[in-house]
């Protein structure tokens, strides 16, 4: 996607965009010191003086992040009030959060996985044998791993889950590099347990990308996470389903011979053990090692652990309460420390965000457990909190919780792998490809899901459509975008005149929205407005890494914006150029990382800012509140698709340089246009594909006018995607008898404001034909 910044066209090759933002911010600060001198005391009537001295764009981003930090801290208290509520509905809500929603196929037997060259029997221990196995999860997805089968009757049945970067062979003692004391699958088998060890998707980046087009440095876990998130699924949910499919087989085996079922995991496997035990009461006890801690810093962990809305209701202790009264053994051990994603290289461009896993202080783990005072949770400390996973004390506690007499866990020599030509990467690649193919099939099926969602509305007439879509609008705002309370502090408008041109005056405007969070922008007021006259307004929205001044400064002619707010003001429209908070690269993208666990997104804040803006604009004596339109480019086009459809205060919306088949755009593994290949991880919206696409959002505006502005050379998407998606809008508006209210203009040009057909559309639809 083209980054929108006024400085981009004049930057020398290789110039860092961050420096561009810093340069523009420095220019703003210089202007901020000069403008008050030239226009002292010149404010819009009924407002207070504007005295903000910092860059309002970056100040806005920082204010939102501070708001999220406060909300994250406050969420701990709110979650505590939920403990003890009905576990059944809570489990179902948690199941949806992690995307473990697909129906598993029955598992009545494991399949031995072997050939004449690579036998299924992998190794033999003193009292058990090891087999390579697979078991079905969905019709098109299997789990694979190792079965450690005791020679006698199993004393217990355990799913032993390794960290993502450990193979099953590591836990079984068949691979070098891990201390024998940490090989807890082998040690459980030596104690007479039947143990099933699944393969997890690892953190390398070998297959993350589109071969022959572009490869990325996203881990395999992130690559699957990105596409799955849009379809309401998750890498975590997929792997929990694999664990629970193993439990399904154990339960089937228990019909013939009953034995208690447990789960034990380390690192990413510890997460899966906790989540699986929370969801399935057939699991009699769980051992979680190298994972359990406070989740208030979830946004600093790898993005593939991001869960939409998790901290609204759950943290590790809340999940422990879902395990209760069954036992949860928490082992404080050294976490599988992760410094970040794989390094980018010339062959693998950086697309992955930062995210770390670090071992927390032992005191913080103790305090997290003490906070809940849960009788079912037992803490075991390995090596002062930095020892190996699967200590004898932890394994003993697990077996005792399953009412199995604990073995001595005396040291034994590990078995020897009898396979001569085994390559674990082939198995891992097969598992990776299955989950990618499964997710892409869900994406292809999502159009039917969307049709089912929108079939709840009545499109027999315009009136019935408006009334019947209100619940759907609420669902989109609350469940997909994330809804904040309506602005709840006085607007306290502050203004300062910064332009005095022959045809208009310009004012900086700042409005309070929530405590500590403000809206900012530039208002252009034509001088031709007569006393008592009320004019139409066009809200002119900048794009990614942009500033309001780039749209509304009469002395600036950006290659992207072409002074469109100024040109419209010169025609007689009142214009307002809001500052949106998608600026500062990772500085703003962390809003998404911090917000998603709270069921909030960047657009949760943008919607509130525009609520306040519409309220304020509508109260100005020279504004006709019934004629306020929206016109946005690029990320401003994304705003055009998400804000006016939900806010009735906008009389129309124009999406420039962004409209396309959004589901394909965010999930495609075939197209160079795909966000799967870029660093824009801020585009992720949980379950978006099953609820809406851009045509659905445009149709939600009916019968308000809607228009698309599209340059043939725009690299956001191909014309064919744009035309395909807009055809649905045109057909729907025609069905409602208002085809003249849906338009598209194609022009020869790039990612830019064209300002020809759109200006005519504004004049017509806002009834400004002078």
Regions found by a protein language model. Give the residues of each.
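Bacterial N-terminal signal peptides that target proteins for export
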Residues: 4-27
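Catalytic cores of nucleotide-enabled group-transfer and carboxylate-activating enzymes in metabolic
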Residues: 119-139, 150, 182-191, 195-196, ...
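Proline/glycine-enriched tight loop/beta-turn segments at coil->beta junctions
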Residues: 141-143, 150-158, 164-166, 516-519, ...
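Cap/lid segment of the alpha/beta-hydrolase catalytic domain
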Residues: 158-245, 293-301, 531-619, 665-668
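Alpha/beta-hydrolase-fold serine-hydrolase catalytic core, especially in secreted/extracellular enzymes
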Residues: 41-143, 232-235, 281, 295-518, ...
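Loop/turn elements at helix/coil->beta-strand transitions in domains of secreted/extracellular proteins
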Residues: 155-156, 191-193, 258-259, 281-285, ...
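Primarily recognizes the serine-hydrolase "nucleophile elbow" in alpha/beta-hydrolase
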Residues: 248-319, 615-672, 676
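Bacterial N-terminal signal peptides
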Residues: 24-36
């Amino acid at each position: 996607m083209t980054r929108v910044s006024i400085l981009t066209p004049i930057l020398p090759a290789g110039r860092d965009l961050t420096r561009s933002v810093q340069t523009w911010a420095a220019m703003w600060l210089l202007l901020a010191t000069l403008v008050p001198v030239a226009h002292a005391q010149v404010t819009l009537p009924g407002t207070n003086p504007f005295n903000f001295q910092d860059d309002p764009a970056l100040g806005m981003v920082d204010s939102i992040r501070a708001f999220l930090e406060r909300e994250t801290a406050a969420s701990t208290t709110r979650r505590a009030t939920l403990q003890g509520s009905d576990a059944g509905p809570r489990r179902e809500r948690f199941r949806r959060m992690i995307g473990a929603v697909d129906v598993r196929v029955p598992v009545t037997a494991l399949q031995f996985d072997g050939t004449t060259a690579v036998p299924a029997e992998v190794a033999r221990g003193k009292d058990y044998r090891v087999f390579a196995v697979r078991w079905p999860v969905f019709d098109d997805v299997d789990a694979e791993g190792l079965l450690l089968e005791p020679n006698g009757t199993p004393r217990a049945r355990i799913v032993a889950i390794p960290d993502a970067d450990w193979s099953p062979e590591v836990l079984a003692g068949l691979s070098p590099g891990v201390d024998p004391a940490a090989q807890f699958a082998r040690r459980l088998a030596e104690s007479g347990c039947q143990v099933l060890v699944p393969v997890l998707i690892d953190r390398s980046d070998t297959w993350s990308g589109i071969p022959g087009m572009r490869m990325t440095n996203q881990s395999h876990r992130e690559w699957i996470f990105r596409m799955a998130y849009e379809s309401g699924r998750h890498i975590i949910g997929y792997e929990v389903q694999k664990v629970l499919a193993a439990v399904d087989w154990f339960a089937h085996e228990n019909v013939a011979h009953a034995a208690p079922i447990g789960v034990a995991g380390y690192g990413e496997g510890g997460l899966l053990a906790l989540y699986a035990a929370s969801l399935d009461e057939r699991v009699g006890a769980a051992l979680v090692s190298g994972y359990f801690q406070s989740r208030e810093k979830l946004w600093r962990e790898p993005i593939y652990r991001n869960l939409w809305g998790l901290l609204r209701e759950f943290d590790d202790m809340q999940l422990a309460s879902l395990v209760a009264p069954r036992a949860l053994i928490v082992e404080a051990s050294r976490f599988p420390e992760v410094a970040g994603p794989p390094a980018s290289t010339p062959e693998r461009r950086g697309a992955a965000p930062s995210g770390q896993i670090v071992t927390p202080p032992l005191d913080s783990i103790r305090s997290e457990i003490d906070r809940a005072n849960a009788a079912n949770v037992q803490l075991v400390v390995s090596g002062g909190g930095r020892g190996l996973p699967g200590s004898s004390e932890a394994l003993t506690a697990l077996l005792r919780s399953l009412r199995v007499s604990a073995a001595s866990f005396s040291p034994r020599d590990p078995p020897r792998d009898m396979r001569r030509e085994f390559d674990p990467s082939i198995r891992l690649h097969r598992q990776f490809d299955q989950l990618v193919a499964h997710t892409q099939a869900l994406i292809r099926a999502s159009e039917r899901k969307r049709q089912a969602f929108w079939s709840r509305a009545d499109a027999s007439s315009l009136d019935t459509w408006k009334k019947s879509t209100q619940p759907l609008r609420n669902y989109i705002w609350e469940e997909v975008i994330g809804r904040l309370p309506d602005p709840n502090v006085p607007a306290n408008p502050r203004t300062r005149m910064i332009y005095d041109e022959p045809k208009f005056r310009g004012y900086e405007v700042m409005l309070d929205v929530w405590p500590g969070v403000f809206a900012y922008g530039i208002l252009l007021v034509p001088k031709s407005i007569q006393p008592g006259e009320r004019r139409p307004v066009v809200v002119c929205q900048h794009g990614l890494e942009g500033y309001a001044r780039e749209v509304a400064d009469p002395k600036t002619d950006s290659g992207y914006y072409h002074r469109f707010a100024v040109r419209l003001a010169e025609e007689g429209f009142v214009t307002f150029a809001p500052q949106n908070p998608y600026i500062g690269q990772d500085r703003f993208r962390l809003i998404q990382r911090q917000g998603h666990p709270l069921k909030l997104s960047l657009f949760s804040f943008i919607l509130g800012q525009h609520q306040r803006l519409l309220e304020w604009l509508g109260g100005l004596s020279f504004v006709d509140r019934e004629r306020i339109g929206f016109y946005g480019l690029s990320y401003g086009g994304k705003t055009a698709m998400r804000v006016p459809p939900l806010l009735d205060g906008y009389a129309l919306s124009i999406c420039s340089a962004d409209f396309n088949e959004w589901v394909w755009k965010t999930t495609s593994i075939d197209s160079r246009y795909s966000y799967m290949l870029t660093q824009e991880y801020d585009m992720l919206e949980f379950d978006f594909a099953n609820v809406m696409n851009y045509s659905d959002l445009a149709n939600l505006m009916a019968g308000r006018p809607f228009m698309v502005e599209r340059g043939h050379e725009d690299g956001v998407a191909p014309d064919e995607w744009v035309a395909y998606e807009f055809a649905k809008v045109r057909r729907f508006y025609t069905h409602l008898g208002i085809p003249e209210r849906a338009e598209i203009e194609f022009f020869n040009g790039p990612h830019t404001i064209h300002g020809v057909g759109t200006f005519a559309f504004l004049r017509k639809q806002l009834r400004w034909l002078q």
